[in-house]
């Protein structure tokens, strides 16, 4: 009986959904990667939102999800959302912030799919990710 060919570990790795995490705080980048990787996701972290936007422009396929901070040095999270959604209008995005609340996004056409106030529990983030990516 013929069995389907098995994927090499590298090929299986490539099939996992990619998540971009964007935050100018290195410790939070690391923490979010530790939280998200066990969900079977490939996590790419970016300290600089401009670099994240350039990576998004070149990504094929696009990331399944972006988790971004709001307040960053060179670009805020809303500008990052706008830049990414110009290329991928249905891009799934979670915004995190310790400086603003979600009321500022309610009437924005660029509002994120979910908002998470800092500090947050890892369970809150994983539940949002599972919901958006249907994991």
Model-derived features: positions:
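Non-catalytic signal-transmission and effector/linker regions of two-component phosphorelay proteins
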Residues: 1-20, 30-33, 54-57, 61-62, ...
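Receiver (REC) domain active-site loop signature in two-component systems and cognate sites
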Residues: 72
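A Lys-centered signature of the CheY-like receiver
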Residues: 118
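Hydrophobic/aromatic residues positioned on beta-strands within the core alpha/beta folds
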Residues: 95-96
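Two-component/phosphorelay signaling modules centered on CheY-like receiver
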Residues: 26-44, 132
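Acidic, metal-coordinating helix/loop segments flanking the phosphotransfer/catalytic sites
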Residues: 45-65, 105
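Active-site residues of response regulator receiver
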Residues: 69
């Amino acid at each position: 009986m013929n069995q389907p060919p098995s994927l090499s570990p590298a090929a299986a790795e490539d099939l996992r959904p990619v998540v971009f995490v964007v935050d100018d705080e290195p410790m939070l980048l690391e923490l979010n990667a530790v939280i998200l990787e066990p969900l079977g996701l490939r996590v790419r972290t970016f300290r600089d939102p401009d670099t994240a936007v350039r990576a998004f422009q070149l990504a094929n396929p696009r990331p399944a999800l972006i988790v971004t901070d709001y307040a960053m040095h060179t670009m805020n999270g809303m500008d990052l959302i706008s830049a990414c959604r110009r290329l991928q209008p249905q891009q799934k995005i979670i915004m995190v912030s310790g400086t603003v609340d979600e009321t500022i996004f309610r009437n924005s056409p660029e509002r994120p799919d979910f908002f998470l106030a800092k500090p947050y529990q890892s369970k809150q983030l994983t539940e949002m990710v599972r919901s958006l990516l249907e994991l």
